[in-house]
Structures are given as structure tokens and as C-alpha cells.
Amino acid sequence: MLEKRTPIPVDEAVRRVCHFQKQGETEWVALEDSLHRFLAEDITADHHVPAFDRSPYDGFAVRACDTAEASRENPVRFEVIDHIGAGAVSEKELGPFQAVRIMTGAQIPEGADAVVMIELTQAFEENGKSFMSLKRRFQTGDNISKTGEDAQKGSVLLTKGTRVTPGVTALLATFGYASVPVVRKPVVGIIATGTELLNVSDPLEPGKIRNSNASMVYAQAIEAGATPLYLGKISDELDKSFAAVKEAMKKVDFLITTGGVSVGDFDFLPAIYEKLGADVLFNKVAMRPGSVTTVAHANDMLLFGLSGNPSACYVGFELFVKPIIQTWLLNETPHSICAEAVLTKDFPKPNPFTRFVRALVHHQEGKLLATPVGLDKSSSVTSLADANAFIILPGGTRGYESGRTVQVLLIREENGSEWPWSVLSRSSKL
């Protein structure tokens, strides 16, 4: 176990955590339960879509060659010999100057090679027979959805790691996936430490605070794609805390503890990691908030020791835990996207370490604007409610003025980044 707390750069801390990343195994779920899950394997087309030539419009199926002389001055008439809707197939084959009334989605009948939209025709009856006339020529293939034009048999439709959206469910249903192969969600255990913690429903008491971190991390875990398992809060007693952590490790894929990672008299996580024989990857990161964030590895499991301060806990989860969950789910871009934004108000604080300022980012006139929200203190809760990004201010800088371009991590975006830290490393040298 590391005894000395030597801060390491943020990107190095992320790299150490990612060294122990895993990929989850496959489970099958009903199509209706697959929304927001991640595909565990590639989905390949087992048939063409469309599976047959079909009409994209309501109209008439004709032979294009019969329209060659059609014009305003010389309308060409066709005998309508059949009428078919979607799901029906005409048993008749078209001869010269014959047409079949066809509905959207219906299969093109034998002999036809073009579809005339109904609004371009004039229908009429003559001697008990149905006819239509048109005044323009058509080419072979006009207004026909060709077999396989949407998807070819054998083509890869979706790659593993794809997040299931409503559009993806439509594609899965098209190819008969009543059950869908998805990645099993990792179970993320959550333990809150601290004698000062009250349950959310408890009335306030002198010297006590409500346990907001557990609810926050629980929600973050769901948003990241995991199954959270709240394992309760434990008091600042070493033996009880150790027993609780050891028991929790039997039930989860990853374990998060909040609080107890600093150097106070009742911060027992370092001692717990030592008793577990854990390999401590780091116990101090050169960042604000969350410098005391600690991550260890024991029994093939990552143990995340997040700060007890809400903002620091929140940042620690987004930077270190979320990418591990996303990688488990086969997401090849598991990190938050890094982008440039314009700072909208002064931020005078010095930055001895890299600072992650909770911010609200929005688009305006083709630019991203970033506005710090709430108090920039690790204990702040109010700054988290409106934040959709972190402004990254490199260590060693002092104060940023409104109008300056800064780097931001977009933490609410569904899409991710493969590795944003090289950009941040460059920005710290500017």
C-alpha cells in the first residue's frame, strides 16, 4: 500500500484505472426491455431489406416502355387490371399498356418496372373497365424501392457496443430479434461512510447532514449504464467498515465508497485497503475538487474511494468510474467529449492543480459558451444541479477572464470520446 500521498496528473490517474478495465458478458433480453442497453455482438442482416421490389408511393405499376410517347398533348392510357395493397401480391403479369393499382409498400407485380404516382394520373371508367391515363414518360426503375437497397443480406447492421435507441429497436424488430444480445450491466456497489450521515428522510440534527452522495452516485451509475446496489451507510469504525467492504465485494463487480479517503482521524479507507491487501493505484490526484480520490484493486475488482464532498465525489465518478462502466458495456468511446468553449464570466481563483469547474454549456451563434455555476467548493451541492460540463483550468494558472477560450468536458452528451486527455495535456502547456 502507498503510504505517502504524492499527487499524480489526472490523465495518469485515468490511465492507471483503465489498465484494469473489463468487458461484460452477454445476456439476452426481450426486445421491449433492450432500450438503452448495449449490444454484445454485431447484428448481421439475414435477408435483404426490402426483401422484394416494392412501391414507395400509392399509384400505378406500369411498364416504362409504354410511357415513351406520353406527353401533355398525347396522354397515354392504360387498362387497370388489378388492385393490390401492402402485404398482397398480384397474380397477374402486365402486358402492353396495362397497369396495376398499387399501394405504398406493396410488391411490384410481374412485368412492371416503374411506378407512377397517383397524382400524375387521371382515372376513368369505360365499358365497365377501369383505365388511367398519364402525360409524361417514365424510366425503368422510377419510383421503385429495389430489393436490398436499405440493407443487403450479410451486411453488418449494428456493431457490438451500440447503444439501443428507439431507431435501433426498429431495426432489430425488422430482422426478427424478439430477444436481443446485450452486455450484462455491471453491478456497482455503493457504500457511504461517515457517522455524520443521516438518511434522506431523517430530520436534521446538530452536526449531521443528509446522505446526498449515495443518491447522487446511484443516479450517476444508472445514467452510465450500470445497475447500482446501495449497501447502506457505515459509521467511522474501522472493524465494522472493513467487514462491510469485504462483504460488499462478494456482491458486486465494482465498489464505490464515498468519504473516508482523506487523512482525518476517522478516515479509514486507507487502512481498509491495507487490510484487504489491495494494490492502491493512487491516493492523491493533482486536481480540484477531488484531490483525495483513491482507487485500489483487490480480488480482480476496482475499488473507488470517492471524496465525501459532493462536488468532489461527482467529479471523481465522471472522470474515473464512468469510463470503466462504459468500457464494460463495450463502448469504444467511454470518456467525456472534450471541446473548446468561450468563458462567459471571470474566474479569478488560482489553480495549483487542474481544476474542474462545474459549468453550464450552451450553443450560441455557432459557439459553445461556458458559464461556471454555483460555488466552486468541493462541498457544494447547488453547483451540481445545473452543470452539464466541466471547465478544465490547467494547474499552474492563475485566473481566467471572461471571453477566454477554455477546454470543457461535456458530461451529459450521449456520445463519448476515445481519449480526451491528450488535448488537455496540450492545453496545459499553452
From Swiss-Prot:
InterPro entries: MoaB/Mog-like_dom_sf (IPR036425), MoaB/Mog_dom (IPR001453), MoeA-like (IPR038987), MoeA_C_domain_IV (IPR005111), MoeA_C_domain_IV_sf (IPR036688), MoeA_linker/N (IPR005110), MoeA_linker/N_sf (IPR036135). Binds 1 Mg(2+) ion per subunit. One of its GO terms (molecular function) is metal ion binding. SUPFAM superfamilies: MoeA C-terminal domain-like (SSF63867), MoeA N-terminal region -like (SSF63882), Molybdenum cofactor biosynthesis proteins (SSF53218). Its cofactor is Mg(2+). Keywords: Magnesium, Metal-binding, Molybdenum, Molybdenum cofactor biosynthesis, Transferase. Pfam families: MoCF_biosynth, MoeA_C, MoeA_N. Pathway: Cofactor biosynthesis; molybdopterin biosynthesis. GO terms for cellular component: cytoplasm; cytosol. It comes from the Bacteria. Gene3D superfamilies: MoaB/Mog-like domain, MoeA, C-terminal, domain IV, Molybdopterin biosynthesis moea protein, domain 2, Molybdopterin biosynthesis moea protein, domain 3. GO terms for biological process: Mo-molybdopterin cofactor biosynthetic process. It is an enzyme of class 2 (transferase). Its EC number is 2.10.1.1. The keyword Glycoprotein does not apply. It catalyses: adenylyl-molybdopterin + molybdate = Mo-molybdopterin + AMP + H(+). Catalyzes the insertion of molybdate into adenylated molybdopterin with the concomitant release of AMP. Belongs to the MoeA family. This is Molybdopterin molybdenumtransferase. It comes from Bacillus subtilis (strain 168). The gene is moeA.
